[in-house]
């Protein structure tokens, strides 16, 4: 029997979060359950994803009590700095799209096409460089 993975999308109502959802929809990963999180202001927003209607929920300090395997953070640096360590402390592997951890020596900065092996160095949080850097190192 295949394991089902739980993936939290933080910042799901924003531009980067919606782009992440679009990519995930294109990939149509098997054995994944999704939960969408957003700011208090955007809570209750309905988002069509994978043929279903999801309701984005406010991100709180208790949001990761559900036992997520992974989280994609696309809600800005302040949100990432506050909530990524909470998620990681509960066993969730965080992929952060903000600048919050890019200069942190304990957080690997990963471009999958360039240094995928560095993912193994994570302590619960993985950062990615900004879009200009990614283009420069991939080309």
What are these language model-derived features?
Residues 1-139:
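N-terminal Rossmann-like NAD(P) cofactor-binding subdomain of oxidoreductases
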